């Protein structure tokens, strides 16, 4: 949870943490998480919508409404005018907790192409493993000083963004209808 809270605080907006309660969750575990989040200075509510429907999410809804009434000073993590490489490096530092980024030869060539086509203003989406804050599925928890391996970039010109492929991640192929 620290990784997510540290990431979100960079945006300078109110944060509400939701614990999705399930029937087999222990009260001790829920209270531990809730107390930990509150000790970090964040609002934390439990949603029991899984078993109680909308009634189980009323406290969460109230907390979200209250946070929306606060003045926020949203700031994006990257500037639109940053180069794609600078955007990747900033995300790596602020989101993935690392200062080191390695680019494959293919990625370096794509970065040059993106600049040549005048597409550096596009936002980026990093495709990486869901198992870790890094691009290595074996680095669990909140690893520090890991290396983000950028192996390729995909220009999604129609959709208006660049996909950054990191580690050994593959995008989902189109599946047959049958």
Model-found features: residue ranges?
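P-loop NTP-binding site
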Residues: 1-178
């Amino acid at each position: 949870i620290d990784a997510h809270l540290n990431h979100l605080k960079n945006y300078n907006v109110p944060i509400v943490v939701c614990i999705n309660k399930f029937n087999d969750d222990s009260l001790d575990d829920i209270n531990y998480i809730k107390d930990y989040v509150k000790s970090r200075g964040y609002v934390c509510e439990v949603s029991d919508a899984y078993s109680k429907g909308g009634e189980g999410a009323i406290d969460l809804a109230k907390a979200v409404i209250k946070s929306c009434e606060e003045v926020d000073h949203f700031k994006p993590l990257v500037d639109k005018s940053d180069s794609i490489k600078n955007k990747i490096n900033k995300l790596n530092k602020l989101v993935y907790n690392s200062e080191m980024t390695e680019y494959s030869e293919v990625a370096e060539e794509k970065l040059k192409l993106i600049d040549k086509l005048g597409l550096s203003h596009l936002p980026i989406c990093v495709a990486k493993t869901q198992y870790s804050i890094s691009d290595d599925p074996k680095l669990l928890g909140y690893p520090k000083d890991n290396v983000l391996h950028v192996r390729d970039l995909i220009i999604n010109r129609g959709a208006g963004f660049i996909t950054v492929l990191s580690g050994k991640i593959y995008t989902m192929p189109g599946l047959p209808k049958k």
